[in-house]
Curated annotation (Swiss-Prot):
The name this protein goes by in its record: Protein RecA
Chief place where the protein resides: cytoplasm
GO CC aspect terms: cytosol
Residues annotated as binding ATP: 64-71
Region of interest: Disordered: 328-352
Domain of life, per lineage: Bacteria
Organism: Brevibacillus brevis (strain 47 / JCM 6285 / NBRC 100599)
Keywords: ATP-binding, Cytoplasm, DNA damage, DNA recombination, DNA repair, DNA-binding, Nucleotide-binding, SOS response
DNA damage listed as a keyword: yes
UniProt GO molecular function: ATP binding; ATP hydrolysis activity; ATP-dependent DNA damage sensor activity; damaged DNA binding; single-stranded DNA binding
One Pfam family this sequence matches: RecA_C
Length: 352
């Protein structure tokens, strides 16, 4: 055994000499085995992902039908990374990013790096350069379907370009995956849906760009609208289901239900109420919601309004929920409140 041990030590020294220190190591010697994450900005999705958010140094694919909320989910992740002091980049291949909407979701558009490339090759080369810099914490590509190969752009309308996009994605991901892992960048690829022709049995839906992204992605999210949120005759948003169809860092197939409110994004208060009432942090009696014997409101929408007007209570509930699911409590936004200890009245909260 001593001869084998000596041979192994000699081989390890040779590998480190040739490829550099850290090129091979025992798994127990790795300083941080725990997966580092960044909150998705949606409490329900953090819980469904199993590790408290999107894993750093991994590839994430978000796909679903049109107007289902894919870009909204990605923008919330960007806003959360920026809130923690990170740098974000958005590669807008669809040329459709609305900066006003992004700002409403909490994105700091003054600091967001934006690229609107002409070709798929250009988009992926920009992504690679940003990842290899090691200075970008999250990068979003919107969308894979809009990454048009240069040959297709320069060709005639109607020319056949079979498999060009799939080859482009396959080559890019081969180059990107290692760099993404080393730089601990979260790489989010938004994708569309297509129908397979002639499928009689099984799911006819597929995503463009070939199979490479399906293999390289550590997390795949399927975003679907469930139903509209109405107050009277007015439609204010939609209940949306986000299914974790692939997860390499936690058990898959969990579903997060969130409220996407038009012009506001994912409702933080809605997730707090739903999950809080499921685990009895928030008590529900009939139509009334209450927390620590204080009534929040009658009906879900009224209770959401109350939590929006009282962010300190919302933060208390969210902290208890995160403790229950062993999630990172630092992801709870602090209520921006000024309180004078000499005053006996309730603290006032600036909602502007």
């Amino acid at each position: 055994m001593s001869d084998r041990r000596a041979a192994l030590e000699s081989a390890l020294r040779q590998i480190e000499k040739q490829f550099g220190k850290g090129s091979i190591m025992k798994l127990g010697e790795v300083s941080n085995i725990q997966i580092s994450t960044a909150s998705s900005g949606a409490l329900a999705l953090d819980i469904a992902l199993g590790v408290g958010g999107f894993p750093r140094g991994r590839i994430v694919e978000i796909y679903g039908p049109e107007s289902s909320g894919k870009t909204t989910v990605a923008l919330h992740a960007i806003a959360e990374v920026q809130r923690q002091g990170g740098q974000a980049a958005f590669i807008d291949a669809e040329h459709a990013l609305d900066p006003v909407y992004a700002a409403k979701l909490g994105v700091n558009i003054d600091e967001l790096l934006l690229s609107q490339p002409d070709t798929g090759e250009q988009a992926l080369e920009i992504a690679e350069a940003l990842v290899r810099s090691g200075a970008v914490d999250i990068i979003v590509v919107d969308s894979v379907a809009a990454l048009v190969p240069k040959a297709e752009i320069e060709g005639e309308m109607g020319d056949s370009h079979v498999g060009l996009q799939a080859r482009l994605m396959s080559q890019a991901l081969r180059k990107l995956s290692g760099a993404i892992n080393k730089s601990k960048t979260i790489a989010i690829f938004i994708n569309q849906l297509r129908e397979k022709v002639g499928v009689m049995f099984g799911n006819p839906e597929t995503t463009p760009g070939g199979r490479a992204l399906k293999f390289y992605a550590s997390v795949r999210l399927d975003v679907r609208k469930a139903e509209s949120i109405k107050v009277g005759n007015d439609i204010l948003g939609s209940k949306t289901k986000i299914k974790v169809v692939k997860n390499k860092v936690a058990p898959p197939f969990k579903v997060a239900e969130v409220d996407i409110m038009y012009g506001e994004g994912i409702s933080r208060e809605g997730s707090i109420l739903d999950i809080g009432s499921e685990i009895d942090v928030v008590q529900k009696s009939g139509a009334w919601y209450s927390f620590n014997e204080e009534r929040l409101g009658q009906g879900r929408e009224n209770s959401k309004v109350f939590l929006k007007e009282n962010p300190h209570i919302a933060s208390q509930i969210e902290t208890k929920v995160r403790e229950y699911f062993s999630l990172n409590p630092s992801s709870v936004p602090e209520a921006e409140a000024e309180h004078d200890p000499e005053q006996d009245e309730e603290p006032t909260f600036d909602l502007e």
